[in-house]
Amino acid sequence: MRVAALISGGKDSCYNMMRCIAEGHQIVALANLRPDDNQVESDELDSYMYQTVGHHAIDLYAEAMALPLYRRTIRGRSLETGRVYTRCEGDEVEDLYELLKLVKEKEEIEGVSVGAILSDYQRVRVENVCKRLNLQPLAYLWQRNQEDLLREMIASNIEAIIIKVAALGLDPDKHLGKTLGEMEPYLLELSKKYGVHVCGEGGEYETFTLDCPLFKKKIVVDTSEAVIHSADAFAPVAYLRLSGLHLEEKVSSVPGDDETTSYIHNS
């Protein structure tokens, strides 16, 4: 099946792409929703649906994976927030519809890779959009045991770093920029102590993937800056602004056509 992958830059969307390929599907394009650059704090958008921290680095995915990348600015807001989603003009879900509609027209996709694990809110809305476009959602991580998933991601050579913290026990000074492998023991400890979701499904943390077996090049962070979003004494919210990045060549672990053209389509 020809598949477009919804990517946030995080570990979950990356690992679900790997699972899609393992199941015999072909990733032919990447799709991402981004905040408006004119917003004062465009790094961190208040959205129920989309991870936006790290969005400045998403363009590198097109070159790293040698795939076309389609991006759309999020124009809507979270308006229809009930358990069942009904098409609602001005809702941010309609931005996803317009994005995938374009990708389907351009790339003739049949399915969509979705990295959702636990959020019914996200699942219901992605399924609504896919049904309207006659696309098959592929969510191989859905309701998997999170400890197992984290272990699998690390074992699968996904190199992802923590770029946002928002939970009791996570310290911006100590944990921003750490890799999943470095954080695994501590995340398991926090899960036992405070009930923290080890994959961050409760919003405890977010990640950005620098390398994985699907990348033909790896992303390298040259400079970054920690930004405090909320200075709560017990659970501060902070994120890492990736201000300087470049790509480095690597030995490709993905058999494929070296002639593949990457390009970015913004709307």
From Swiss-Prot:
Record bears the keyword Phosphoprotein: yes
GO biological-process terms attached to the record: protein histidyl modification to diphthamide
InterPro entries: Diphthami_syn_dom (IPR002761), DPH6/MJ0570 (IPR030662), Rossmann-like_a/b/a_fold (IPR014729)
Keywords of this entry: ATP-binding, Ligase, Nucleotide-binding, Phosphoprotein
EC number: 6.3.1.14
Residue numbers carrying Phosphotyrosine: 97
SS bonds (residue pairs): none
Single GO MF annotation: ATP binding
Pfam families on file: Diphthami_syn_2
Keyword Ligase carried by entry: yes
Reactions catalysed, as given in the entry: diphthine-[translation elongation factor 2] + NH4(+) + ATP = diphthamide-[translation elongation factor 2] + AMP + diphosphate + H(+)
Pathway participation: Protein modification; peptidyl-diphthamide biosynthesis
Described purpose of this protein according to its UniProt entry: Amidase that catalyzes the last step of diphthamide biosynthesis using ammonium and ATP. Diphthamide biosynthesis consists in the conversion of an L-histidine residue in the translation elongation factor eEF-2 (EEF2) to diphthamide.
Protein family per UniProt: Belongs to the Diphthine--ammonia ligase family.
Identification of the protein by name: Diphthine--ammonia ligase
